[in-house]
A protein has these predicted regions:
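Acidic/histidine-rich catalytic neighborhood of metal-dependent amide-processing enzymes
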Residues: 148-250, 275
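Extracytoplasmic/secreted proteins, especially bacterial periplasmic and envelope-associated proteins
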Residues: 55-65, 78, 82-89, 159-166, ...
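Solvent-exposed loop/turn segments at secondary-structure junctions
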Residues: 70-71, 100-103, 120-122, 132-136, ...
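A non-catalytic alpha/beta surface segment that caps or lines the substrate-entry region
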Residues: 58-121
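N-terminal Sec-pathway targeting helices
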Residues: 1-14
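Second-shell loop/turn segments in exported
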Residues: 43-50, 65-74, 101-104, 146-158, ...
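N-terminal capping segment at the start of a domain
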Residues: 31-80, 90, 302-320
Length: 341
């Protein structure tokens, strides 16, 4: 997840001109888009297969056990191979996007996006995405001696992937007319560290995998895309992020409404926040309506939202992962997918 220095009190309005993102400041707004009716065409509400938190937790633990998943290292390669094998074991059609993108240091970072599809022939589709790399630096750790050491990324990285793997596992019971494309974006979290001087293109040092994906001009076959980022910590709070409301406000309201209906309103807060730079922003650039389910909490003064105390520190490990949080996210998404409009 992108550094929260870029989480600001007003929304950065995105214009897509000639394939580039131009950011301008504008007052924050409230979306007027309504909540969709959550029924199938014949009026029935479908109950999804059970989302099992034990297996979801185990998927997160397995990723962390590989060690830091830094693009180009052995841990990263082995974890990627394991992820592909798991999706294939759930009868997903899997393909990879491999390439490289410029990084903040002036060089290039490798990209290995993983795309796993369920019911590839279905025309009613949704994208569920997360990033699978982990941060090369613990640059916000309270111990300065650890700032240049890679972190586990249990929450920031592995948690979203764990939820997607569990959804893939239970997808054998998904109605055949509904298709899901699981996208694991690579090289999301290698952006400019805290100690490096600021530059005018810092925002582009993050989310390299989704930038690479957008450059491939993906065909628009999905209703919308849902990004999961930092969805496993105890006490997580998911607010209606600004770019998400601009791009896919109806879908945001529907998912948050589903969460409230299922008893997870404590996690899915009915409050809007400023926009942040995350993988969904580059999906939006590719003309895909997209939203971000991301843990952001008010700071101690209540003046702005932040990513929490473990963000980009060495405390982002398995000790902060909460099964009730995983259940809230996974059950809500399963219910939404099974009743996709």
């Amino acid at each position: 997840m992108k550094n929260n220095k870029k989480v600001i009190a007003i929304v950065l309005v995105v214009s897509v001109v000639g394939g580039f993102l131009f950011k301008t400041f504008a007052p924050y707004f409230k979306s007027s888009k309504g909540v969709e009716n959550n029924t199938t065409e014949n009026g029935a509400i479908l109950e999804p297969a059970d989302f099992m938190t034990d297996s979801c937790y185990a998927f997160i633990q397995k990723q962390v056990a590989f060690g830091p998943r830094i693009p180009g290292n052995t841990n990263h390669a082995e974890c990627g191979n394991w992820l592909i094998a798991k999706f294939k074991s759930y009868n997903c059609t899997v393909k990879e996007q491999v390439g490289s993108m410029p990084n903040w240091e002036g060089g290039n970072t490798s990209v290995r996006n993983i795309i796993a599809s369920v019911h590839a022939g279905a025309t009613k589709r949704i994208v569920l995405a997360a990033h699978w790399d982990s941060r090369p630096y613990g640059d916000k750790d309270p111990d300065p001696s650890k700032h240049k050491q890679p972190i586990d990324g249990a929450n920031d990285g592995a948690s979203g992937v764990g939820v997607l793997l569990e959804l893939a596992r239970i997808s054998k019971d998904l109605p055949e007319d509904i298709g899901v494309d699981f996208i694991l974006f690579d090289s999301e979290d290698g952006g400019k560290p805290e100690w490096a001087p600021d530059g005018e293109n810092d925002a582009y040092s993050w989310c390299l995998g989704s930038q690479f994906w957008a450059k491939q001009k993906p065909q628009r076959t999905m209703r919308y895309a849902v990004l999961l980022d930092m969805v496993g910590a105890e006490g997580a709070r998911f607010h209606k992020e600004g770019y998400s409301m601009q791009s896919a406000g109806t879908a945001v309201n529907r998912i948050w409404g589903n969460a409230a209906k299922l008893g997870y309103g404590e996690y899915f807060q009915n409050e809007e926040t400023a926009g942040i730079v995350d993988d969904h922003l580059f999906m939006i650039q590719a003309n895909v309506p997209s939203l971000d389910i991301v843990d952001m909490r008010p700071n101690f003064m209540g003046t702005q939202f932040e990513f929490g105390g473990s963000h980009h520190t060495h405390s982002d490990n398995m000790s902060i992962i909460s099964k009730p949080t995983l259940k809230a996210v996974g059950h809500t998404l399963a219910y939404t997918v099974w009743n996709l409009k």
